[in-house]
Each structure stands twice: as structure tokens, then as C-alpha cells.
Amino acid sequence: MKGFMINQLRAGLFMAATFTLTAGMTPDANAGGIALGATRVIYPQGDKQASLPVINSSSNNTFLIQTWVANADGVKSSDFIITPPLFVIHPKKENTLRIMYAGPDLPTDRESVFYLNSKAIPSIDKSKLNGNTLQIATQSVIKLFV
């Protein structure tokens, strides 16, 4: 029983050390990135628009941001207009999304929920490429209450 517990402790320490070393070896692990200015958007039904800041906290990465609204099934909704739907955000800059509802009347006795999607595609300097490269785009999804 004692040997089993020692092996469990060793395995846990090995996993923690491996994670710590791998995270430190990744060059952009702590470089920052794209953040949305809220965890949810509340769009009051009588208002013309709602706003959401998008922040690039990276000191050297530029991103292409694509945004859209989807319904509960994940299908893109044409009832919303987001400006700008596609834009470039430079390092240490901020942009504001404007979300406008242009669809039919929604129920007034309860909130309707939609999902705001924001995809961040990192730019790449082709002159610095040598060999294979893996580029990962991240997508954030937050709730949009109307």
C-alpha cells in the first residue's frame, strides 16, 4: 500500500514537472493575445445597439478577427448586424464591436439567448518561415442575451 502511494506521488510530480517545462518552452505561451471585454453581452430590447470591446494584449502579434452571431443550434443568425464583422487588430490595440438587432420581434416575457462568436486568426511573417509551421486560430463564444 505504501509503495502504491509513493508511485502515485511520483507520477503526479512527473506530470507537474512535464507541464511546467513544456509551458516554459513555448515561445508565445505568455505573450498575450485576444480578449473580449465581457463574459456575456446583454442587449436591452429597446436599445439600438450593444457594444463589446476586443483587446489585443500581445506586444508583437497582429490578428484578423471575424465575428458573427449564432442561435442556440449553432446556426449563423442573419437577425444581427455586427460592425465590423472582419477587421485587423494590431498589438496593444483595442476595437469596439457594435451589435445591432435587425430581426423580427422577440418574445417580451422572457430573454432570448444567442451566441456571439469571435475567431482570432494570427498573422504570420512569411519571410521568417523555415520548415513546417502550425498556425492555430482560436474561437471565443459568449452568450448574447436580448
Label the predicted regions:
Residues 2-16:
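Bacterial N-terminal signal peptides that target proteins for export
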